[in-house]
Amino acid sequence: MSSLETIKKSLRNYLPTSVNIDDFIKAEMTLALLEKCKPEGDPTKAYLLLHNYSLLGEVVCDETAFLLQKAHRLLHSCSSKMNWAKVLENYRNAQSEFCLYIFTEKIEKGSKILKFARNTELAVEPDRADVYFKYIRKHKEDRHFEYAKGGEYSYSIKDKTSSTVYSADVKIPDRTPQMPISPPPKKTRKKISVSTDELLASAVEMAEKKPDDYCYSILKSNTLKAVTEGNVKSANRLEIDKITNLVGMVGSGKSTLMKVLSYHLAKADKKVLLVLDTVSSVLEMCSYLSQFGVSVSPVIGRSGREKYIDQVAKAHEKYLQNEYSKYLTAPCIIDGMAKNKSDKSSVPMFGSEPCRSLMKNKKHYNCPYMDICPAVRMYRDVYTSNVIVTTVQGLAAIRLLGDNKLFLEYVLEQADLVIFDECDKVQKTLDEFFTPSASFDKFRQNAATLCSEAMNKETEALDGMEKNESGYIRKLMRSLGVCMAVREAISAYGGTWRTILSRTFSAEILYQAICRENQKNKYISDKSLEHMRRVTIGLDHDKDIEHILKFALSEDDIKIFSSDISDWLTDNNCKPDKTFSDHIKLYLVVAAFDNYIREISDSYLFLPYERKTQQELTDFLSTRFTAQQKILPSSAMGNLFGMKNDPQKGLILYRQYAFGRALMDRMPWLRLTDEGQPAGPNVLLLSGSSWADGCLQYHVNVPVKYLLEAEEWKRRKIAESKMIDLGTAIRVSGSGSEEREENLTEVIKKIMGTIEAELRSEGKLLMIVNSYSEAQTAANYLNRLLSNGKTVACMCREADEFDENMILRSEIADFSDHSADIMVAPAQAIERGYNIVDKDGHSAFGSVFFLVRPMEVPDEISSKCTKLNGYLERHCVLSGKKNAFDRAAKLRSEATRQWSLMERQGKMQLSSLDPVMKLDVTASLFVLILQIFGRLCRITDESKPAPRVYFADGAFRRSEKNTAGYDLLNELIDYLDSMIDNKETGKIAETLYQPFYEAFKKGVEKNEFADISDDIYSEEEEF
């Protein structure tokens, strides 16, 4: 059989030199995959096979799944609809007698359809499809990197307080680093099986090494139960095979189990990864496990080290603990060797070390001291540690040193077990992580500094500016005019598109809307429209359309722009009405804006390292997740770029890169064997609220295999909790931004008697709002009303201006020692991840007041994306599709349909939502309320009062006049009833939620009403 190189050489002898051989072969590889999966499939949609969609829905484990997974990596550039159209067109234009496939066009149901078939008369390399498949299966990506040899190098140091960049020179002796070498990738992982007795024995060992450790007492007092076909019974063994979902209510010992299991497996020389919520949690876990002799290390980002130091530094201590300092404050060897540094550039540059940016002759080199440098020790320790601890972001994005491999790739190849704590939050975080968004208006404001610096340069400095940088600055200087041109075009040309433009949109969406209009009225030929589109995306050239695009983003040239469009329409025999003409104009403006953003993105990538600034949009543009896209399934609607015109925030840009949650719930299958069997690590999912059927964001679609049940007395105590509807008629949530602050203070004023009574009870008070600004408003108002020395603290971000009435988010775990009696916090910031307890481990809070209905902003792009992913996992049945092509096409069409539905319902009344989306709202609010309630349920002292929960916002109830309106408290009762009464999964819900359910039903009656009407499904202010 021939090799791929032989085929390339043969084709070069026959094909014209104008044909790109690599693209030619990519086209044939992709078509060969389509032929294998569905010979009668549409070749223009063959790119759908390159998205790794076999992992979604019911996972397919066969040889074809492995082949497609490898093709997803190798042919990733062809997975784009636009790129594939270019590659396919160029292939069709090549000489057909040398092509593996030939094409015919047929008319079916009035539409032109492209068909393809094998060229049976092919004389040159006729067996090359088999060669392609072999090459795809065996392909491995090469990584090219080079260490600095002996000689003179330079590197840059950024002043973190300004945009100033300093340079330093260093002379490096010749040395070759002895970097750790990763062993060969592991094959399929054996299931992990450990008995409860073995876990208890390991917990005893931990207690012997550290007598005050609590793991044994907690593990012994809680009960592990197995779930089999809806039946629940006690289990004496924990088995983790591929992916295992273990749930348990707050206080059931999930974190304890994670610690003991990590210790137990480390003794057996297993490689375990723990994925936690915050960097401080990561560092604390490493410090904890190291006390027992476990070989453990963190993997965290480099750029935030100064912030991490503040988070783990203990009050009144002069030095960090060694477990922290060896990773956070270690010096850089190169920095110590540097010469001609200025005073300002001589400070420790934590997180900005030149590990990959030593410069010589305009080329970057890796530091030759990576193998011994203290500053990057944590990335070397990955290779030798039994237990590695990281965050979601660390797992998804960090690269290891040396060969620059993704840490995720290393985990897929080497880890025996990955444990995701709070897995329901993890999946939401992953979905949002791979759907970044950015404000173009903020970018425009930030660009002013760089443009001002350039304008103030002396002539000599301006002449000496690097070409890429000067080009980038010129593009930035256009940003104000571009922003105004786009927003004014939306206002002037929107016409009947008001609905479309109120949602997320892109040039492609506008083009499809134009095509629909044209089908009704036939203003212009379909051929002319398609030609216009092809020019805007670079598939064709047309000097007239390109001239129009040149003036599309210039306010000063609006007359030229309009005149040129009129001329082009006339030349194409088009006599449109004003609305259609305006829509053409708006499409071209948005298409030109797309191109402008791509130009900025490309220019930024080629900037010198020292001139790259950390700004929201530049991060958005430069973070392309290229390596991650080759591992994860693509976004269900494709890796899209789009925008939203927000009246308050301006132009918001967004991208969808990947089906984020697959990193967690499909991890064992992210690497497949040749036979299609999972070759990734085993996964253990832990959470107290991941079983919330109907919740698109938080429900984890992995069957529950184990339950962890807390002690009976704790369940009884939680069931004794007081749930009280305060019955206020004042609605905070859903009110307009003008009334919202006033309504919030009115609610506080009305319930002040209850607040003062709670202050006389045991425990501190927690007040829940929806944003940091609301927290500030509520805290200030409460401090004015309170007497007897009682005080309030509001949670604030790290970057906020700090005063004595604030508490940093990173410090709230120590609130029991704070002087304040009340803490006001945004729901999304405190819902989980913090055990706010006293010295005995009992919750610092005795009661919680929901001053608002704790909803996130439902019309946020990232929120809709995670809901879409949840919907597709739960409702898009793909198992009935026999081949990968049909599965991919079904997924894409269903995703598009559901996204459109969510866009339409974004501003609807809650009571008007379709059943799936309405259930999602209820289930999501339940999870949020339950998690916040969990801050009160850390119970160690049975003698203390049970928690108290107050619902203060009138928006928890519907209007008495609107009996069909949305009543959250009624809906929660119905939702809990349906889960507890479910014959198949009721036992799971009972174990998790029965105590909350009992307390809620005792305290909250159905059919109570507020006296103000239901409002729209939208919150004005975002968390």
Predicted regions and their residues:
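Conserved motor-coupling elements within RecA-like helicase/translocase cores
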Residues: 377-385, 791-824, 837
